[in-house]
């Protein structure tokens, strides 16, 4: 069992800020765990930042299982959280349970489900059989078409009511935490105060119990990123500089340098071997 558990995350509410970051492969997960994050999250955002999809709607269970396995092998301390992709739980509670089990078998400690009130029965059943669940309300990318695109949530009485209802339903169903995405900070604060489980914000202000960002946004790997994301590095330029230098050195004959390859020390021995091989191969 890893050091950080859902129980530990729950106990952090109001005491210590929860840190969460996405990771989609072994080396990224190694670094995230070494950096001390509480939660390493295999998000369905991989569809967009890894596979170049226009949204998360085309992400499959097979992709989530594949990436969860890679991340789980790397993480020793943090809680490993895997997203339930679109279509993996909407049809029936039974199908949702089967797919959640697959993610746990791939190495996840818990699963995340978008939506709240509508999926309370699934959350309750998953928790009953021993699969911890993190909920997700506010902007739910899997439902962005219904929401009218990617936009900030909580600006109307109806939206505030829906967000709070989702949060309370998730709490009652046994979720150990809730993601609040792109919600007005006042609303995120209200939800955080009204539920006993931690809230983890993304673009939802400072009044939540923790924060999550996407790996690629933190590192500046793309030209653009969501307005709520902060770049802590500009790795796109660093990577471009590095691989361009490699290409140039190959073109100019500078790579490999003498320290990057090995030769026979005994040239006479190599000549003997070469002559014998050429003779055997009739060359």
UniProtKB/Swiss-Prot annotation:
**In its keyword annotation, does this UniProt entry include Disulfide bond?**
no
List, alphabetically, the Gene3D superfamilies matched. Answer: Phosphoenolpyruvate-binding domains (3.20.20.60)
EC number, UniProt record:
2.1.2.11
Pfam short name (any one): Pantoate_transf
Q: What is its main location?
A: cytoplasm
Which cofactor is essential here?
Answer: Mg(2+)
Q: Which UniProt keywords apply?
A: Coenzyme A biosynthesis, Cytoplasm, Magnesium, Metal-binding, Transferase
Binding-site residues for 3-methyl-2-oxobutanoate, renumbered to this chain: 44-45, 83, 112
Q: Where on this chain does Mg(2+) bind?
A: 44, 83, 114
The cofactor binding remark recorded in the entry reads:
Binds 1 Mg(2+) ion per subunit.
Q: Name one GO biological process term.
A: pantothenate biosynthetic process
Recorded hits in HAMAP family, A to Z, give: PanB (MF_00156)
Which family does the similarity line name? Answer: Belongs to the PanB family.
- What does the subunit comment say? Homodecamer; pentamer of dimers.
Q: What is this protein called?
A: 3-methyl-2-oxobutanoate hydroxymethyltransferase
Source organism per UniProt = Pyrococcus horikoshii (strain ATCC 700860 / DSM 12428 / JCM 9974 / NBRC 100139 / OT-3)
């Amino acid at each position: 069992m890893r050091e950080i558990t859902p129980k530990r995350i729950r106990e952090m509410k109001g005491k210590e800020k929860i840190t969460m970051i996405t990771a989609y492969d072994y080396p990224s997960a190694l670094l995230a765990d070494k950096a001390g994050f509480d939660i390493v999250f295999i998000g369905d955002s991989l569809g967009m930042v890894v596979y170049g999809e226009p949204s998360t709607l085309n992400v499959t269970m097979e992709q989530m299982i594949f990436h969860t396995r890679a991340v789980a092998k790397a993480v020793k301390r943090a809680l490993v959280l895997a997203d339930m992709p679109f279509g993996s739980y909407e049809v029936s509670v039974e199908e949702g349970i089967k797919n959640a089990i697959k993610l746990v078998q791939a190495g996840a400690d818990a699963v995340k489900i978008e939506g709240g009130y509508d999926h309370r029965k699934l959350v309750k059943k998953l928790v009953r059989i021993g699969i911890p669940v993190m909920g997700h309300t506010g902007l739910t990318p899997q439902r962005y078409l219904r929401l009218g695109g990617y936009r900030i949530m909580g600006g109307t009485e109806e939206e505030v009511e829906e967000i709070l209802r989702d949060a309370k339903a998730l709490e009652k169903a046994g979720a150990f935490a809730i993601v609040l995405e792109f919600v007005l900070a006042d609303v995120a604060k209200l939800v955080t105060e009204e539920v006993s489980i931690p809230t983890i914000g993304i673009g939802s202000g400072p009044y939540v119990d923790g924060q999550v960002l996407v790996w690629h946004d933190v590192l500046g790997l793309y030209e653009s990123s969501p307005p709520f994301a902060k770049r802590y590095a500009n790795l796109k330029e660093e990577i471009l500089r590095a691989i361009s230098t490699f290409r140039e050195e190959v073109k100019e004959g500078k790579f490999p340098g003498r320290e990057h390859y090995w030769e026979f020390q005994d040239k006479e021995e190599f000549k003997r071997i070469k002559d014998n091989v050429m003779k055997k191969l009739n060359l």
